[in-house]
């Protein structure tokens, strides 16, 4: 099955973007192929561009507390108690995290130079920066992975918070089986509810991909046929509406 996720507000869009960038970083850190370190540095700078914003930390703490209070008001179960404990721990980690506003590399001239070159038209190129080439040649894969892991330590609480919140959101979903012979179908929403995420699941070898447009009253699903031909057979898929 292939799953597509569509945020219904800018806050969830931001959370999804941050989640994906962290996943990209983890994948490249475990990649032994040539130029993976180049991508790791570029991705690390992307992470720092949002992690160094003080408002993100505040927003995450507020959302964590909101979810904790919601769970506290529900019937006590082992699972709910565990989640509340995890949320308390994550909030504490966020509050203690040393996130400094702006790009601050603690006087690390090597990182400052890499950041400058990452913003140049050619990006990070070892030919233009002998010190970077020396670093690549003098470190092993294990050492480079440990280097990046250490750099992410101070902002790991952001990754954990985002991952936990998105897990809670995806688990609080109402799914519907949908079928259409046209390339468009509408699902009506309850305007009194606050919906955060649309999750569309298609077969593993689909002949189309979805896009959506939405408002507080409905989600319009647009199915784009890859071949460009008109659809003759019914398309079946799952439509999930998730909310905090």
Feature locations, PLM:
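Charged, well-structured binding/catalytic surfaces in domain cores that contact anionic ligands
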Residues: 93-195
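N-terminal ordered "arm"
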Residues: 2-62
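Eukaryote-specific, cytoplasm-facing alpha-helical/coiled-coil scaffolding segments in long proteins
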Residues: 46, 70-74, 115-119
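An exposed acidic His-Trp-rich patch
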Residues: 79, 181-187, 241-243
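Hydrophobic/aromatic-rich structural module bridging two neighboring secondary-structure elements via a short loop
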Residues: 52-110
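Alpha-helical rod/repeat scaffolding segments in eukaryotic adaptors/tethers
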Residues: 4, 33, 77-80, 104-107, ...
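Extended, charged low-complexity segments
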Residues: 192-244
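Amphipathic alpha-helix face/heptad-repeat signature
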Residues: 7-17, 40-43, 60, 79, ...
